[in-house]
């Protein structure tokens, strides 16, 4: 037998009347902090402070670990050891693939001095994910887990709600967005908490295009720290701009949300460390092999001249429309596998700083990495075709816009 | 035997799941951490029991895709036993979902989670009375520290479905209690 909702509530009211007693409740410090962090006047400055601390700790810890520790191990010990002991040596194709493709100096090819340049499966293929990305995502996930377990995320959602409503989403969209800053895959999965198809479609498309993942940010932090601020700003502006446009032209509902803001909790060290480890392990399991595979594929494509062929064929688009060197073709292929790998490759191409910014933006928005692609396909089914279409339009308009800006500034 | 962990978002289902199975499911302090189900196993009295951590849902009328997963899980497992996890401080709205599940004929154990938080808030619940009225086991738990979890498992083994009519009838019975001349019954 089924009751109507009204009957159910009546029954519950009666049950509660007989079993439930509320004593005096004193306003505690927890409630005071809760109010402080959610009221706009105090909450917004607090949120900015939190995000600033997050960013500062993230960049300084990642830089400290990579420059102070990882680079020394990889460049002073691992690379020279391989260069001496790996069978084949310079000139051998297998050696080039696995250890060091070498650096052109005039007509001669000399040994690389860093794991950034050597671009072998065992050198760059290990150094990028472990030496650069691992410290970055570890510290990212530590802080993310902290914010999650304390219960800060829903407050951030409340604060940004009005803003996100302007683009047809609501505050809770901040959760998939922040998760995506770690990795787009769980971010796309988290779009399930949004109510309508339209919201999910918009969110997924925006995430895949405009939110760089932790691995990518980690490499950007290493390769182009001086431009990262501008690039992130341009991406966030794109997120809102295209969100606004999609909201206007797409059919479907964008309902209000009633949100539960849970009480703050003391985070448990055990839970935090467990989550951090699980997420990091996920990266080691799925990220590292993909970077190594990516290095291998890119090297093979270079050897057979396929990348050069594509670069030449696509040159008018790259150079004419986007204003980036045609060599960007290589990184764009790598980006299909791993965006972090693509950024590292860009670092090795000669270009002006404006071209570099354009190229990084292009790598970010032009297509999701394979892992995100698969998750989007799984989560959205046929609507994915729509996502791809939106993506194409955005790449050409927003990527071209940046080129136009440089032209107007007279630097392109 | 199959067990589904159901309840509102952010009441601690995943923490209980990790406790029961020793698994490592991500749990956080915000609604919507779990958006897909996870399966796990626990062994009780030499029996393997399959447990599923289900995304949080406010009712059985799904409002988003995570809730759809939850409702679908329930429909696909008509033989399952349910642990309905409730935030003790929000008993009433938790009961709404519990009643819905009871109405569909599932045997159910009620876990009043975050019992400690409710105590701090001076919220007092008459557990025995609640058990008698509902006709199902009610177990106070504190999932993050593990309190009440073993009791929860014990009660789960023998739980039977109850009739929603029985519940409303019990309420009527205990109504008689308050009228003069009532000799008393087990209803309160």
Task: Please give the residue ranges for each predicted region.
Chain B
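Conserved G1/Walker A P-loop phosphate-binding module
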Residues: 1-60, 77
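Helical mechanochemical/support elements of P-loop NTPase systems and associated helical scaffolds
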Residues: 31, 35, 50, 62, ...
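Conserved nucleotide-binding/hydrolysis micro-motifs of P-loop NTPases
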Residues: 32, 56-57, 88-91, 114-118, ...
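Conserved C-terminal guanine-recognition region of P-loop GTPase G domains, centered on the G4
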Residues: 42-46, 69-138
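Canonical P-loop GTPase G-domain recognition
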Residues: 116-167
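Cysteine-cluster motifs in flexible loop/terminal segments that predominantly coordinate metals
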Residues: 171-188
């Amino acid at each position: 037998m089924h009751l109507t909702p009204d009957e159910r509530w009546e029954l519950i009211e009666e049950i509660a009347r007989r079993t439930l007693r509320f004593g005096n409740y004193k306003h505690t410090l927890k409630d005071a902090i809760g109010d402080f962090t959610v009221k706009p006047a105090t909450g917004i400055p607090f949120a900015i402070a939190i995000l600033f601390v997050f960013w500062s700790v993230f960049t300084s810890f990642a830089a400290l670990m990579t420059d102070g520790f990882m680079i020394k191990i990889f460049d002073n010990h691992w690379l020279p050891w391989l260069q001496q002991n790996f069978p084949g040596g310079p000139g051998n194709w297998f050696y080039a693939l696995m250890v060091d493709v070498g650096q052109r100096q005039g007509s001669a090819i000399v040994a690389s001095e860093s794991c950034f340049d050597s671009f072998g499966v065992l050198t760059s293929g290990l150094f990028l994910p472990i030496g650069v990305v691992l410290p970055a995502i570890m510290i990212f996930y530590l802080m993310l887990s902290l914010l999650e377990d304390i219960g800060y995320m829903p407050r951030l959602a409340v604060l940004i709600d009005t803003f996100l409503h302007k683009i047809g989403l609501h505050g809770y969209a901040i959760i998939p967005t922040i998760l995506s800053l770690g990795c787009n895959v769980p971010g796309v999965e988290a779009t399930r908490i949004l109510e309508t198809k339209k919201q999910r479609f918009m969110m997924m498309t925006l995430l895949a295009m405009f939110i760089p993942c932790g691995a990518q940010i980690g490499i950007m932090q290493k390769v182009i720290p001086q431009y990262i601020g501008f690039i992130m700003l341009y991406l966030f502006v794109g997120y809102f701009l295209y969100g606004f446009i999609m909201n206007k032209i797409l059919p479907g509902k964008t309902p209000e949300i009633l949100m539960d803001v849970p009480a703050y909790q003391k985070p448990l060290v055990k839970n935090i460390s467990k989550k951090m480890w699980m997420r990091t392990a996920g990266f080691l399991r799925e990220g590292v092999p993909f970077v190594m595979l990516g290095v291998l594929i890119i090297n093979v494509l270079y050897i057979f001249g396929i990348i050069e062929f594509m670069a030449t064929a696509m040159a008018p688009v790259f150079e004419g429309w986007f204003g980036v060197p045609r060599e960007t073709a290589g990184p764009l292929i790598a980006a299909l596998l791993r965006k972090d790998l693509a950024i590292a490759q860009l670092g090795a191409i000669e270009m002006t700083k404006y071209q570099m910014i354009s190229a990084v933006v292009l790598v970010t928005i032009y297509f999701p990495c394979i892992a995100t692609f698969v998750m989007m396909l799984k989560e959205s089914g046929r609507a994915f075709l729509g996502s791809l279409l939106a993506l194409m339009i955005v790449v050409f308009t927003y990527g071209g816009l940046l080129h136009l800006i440089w032209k107007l500034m007279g630097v392109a | 035997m199959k067990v589904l962990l159901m309840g509102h978002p952010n009441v601690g289902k995943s923490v209980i799941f990790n406790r029961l199975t020793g698994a490592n499911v991500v749990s956080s302090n915000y609604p919507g951490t779990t958006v897909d189900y996870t399966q796990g196993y626990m062994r009780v009295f030499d029996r393997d029991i399959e447990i599923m951590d289900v995304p949080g849902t406010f009712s059985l009328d799904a409002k988003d895709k995570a809730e759809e997963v939850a409702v679908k899980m329930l429909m696909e497992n008509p033989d399952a036993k349910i642990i309905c996890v409730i935030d003790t401080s929000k008993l009433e709205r938790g009961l709404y979902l519990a009643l819905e599940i009871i109405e569909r004929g599932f045997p159910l154990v009620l876990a009043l989670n975050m019992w400690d938080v409710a105590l701090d808030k001076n919220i007092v619940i008459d557990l025995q009375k609640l058990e008698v009225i509902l006709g199902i086991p009610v177990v106070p738990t504190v999932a993050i520290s593990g309190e009440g979890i073993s009791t929860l498992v014990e009660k789960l083994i023998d739980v039977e479905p109850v009739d929603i009519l029985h519940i409303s009838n019990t309420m009527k019975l205990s109504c008689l209690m308050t009228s003069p001349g009532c000799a008393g019954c087990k209803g309160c």
